[in-house]
């Protein structure tokens, strides 16, 4: 289940993408339009900046804009940055693999086989859905 933090990050980034991405968008505008708590949004945007997804600009014309084109930022990039690995169990994680303590044999574990399929299908959908798709409501059914 996505955390509120991820949902807010997605909403903020989709909003920024919809503005065209040229001029920085003030945090006050993002917070007001998306009805997000400003202080929480500041923390989220700092994480997104540190993760290379947005750039920040100070001053009167300051705010946030995407660090790269919307078509090059996937839903998967955002969720991994905020949540961590997509895998539901550590033994199928690509980036945070850890053997399950209660597993006798990974190669024959039926739970692992199902979780691999879940991970692969989830990653395929999220990694192939960009902010450009979401900002234009072009998500495939």
Model-derived features with residue positions:
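Beta-hairpin "wing" of winged helix-turn-helix
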Residues: 52-67
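Non-DNA-binding regulatory cores of transcription-related proteins
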Residues: 67-141
